[in-house]
Curated annotation (Swiss-Prot):
Protein name, per record: UPF0200 protein TON_1344
Gene3D superfamilies assigned: P-loop containing nucleotide triphosphate hydrolases
Signal peptide limits: none
Presence of keyword ATP-binding: yes
Keywords: ATP-binding, Nucleotide-binding
Gene Ontology MF terms: ATP binding
Homology family: Belongs to the UPF0200 family.
Amino acid sequence: MIIIVTGMPGSGKSKIVKEFEKRGVPSVSMGDVVREETAKRGLELTKENVAKVSIRLRQELGQNAVAKLAVEKVRELLRKNKVVVIDGVRSLDEVGTFRSAFPGEEIIIVAVHTPPHMRFERLKARGRHDDPQSWEDFEERDWKELKFGIGNVIAMADYMIVNDCPKEEYERRVQELVEKILAEH
């Protein structure tokens, strides 16, 4: 089984991924795939370079470029595990790539929704090199994500979790969701 976790930047995807990992489920991060490709191209890991490589990959390999690069990582993990989580799928083309590459696997999409103002504050506090420091940067990044088609993936989710609450409550919601998914599938 493949569990795709999607949501806008700063929505809380990593909490879900970490909860699966605590239960022994390995993961592949689509963002890490892009960052690895950025480094392979000899570029410094800045938000500008990562964004450019993300766009360039899609120009070179199609809208499902990052998924194509991630398929082998997922395949390797599925050889040893019954369940693999993919973090950060951004388009239905990418979902389709995984469906085509793994026709015998059940694929479940989990989406996280968090209000924009909460995501902005979390991203500023997170401090990763590609996180926005101004509202304008934040909005620009959101528009890029939406242009990739992330909204369509969110709309097709099998499970939706809302992260509009204190951290402890969200963690409880995540634990319940992960337990439910693993029990039902």
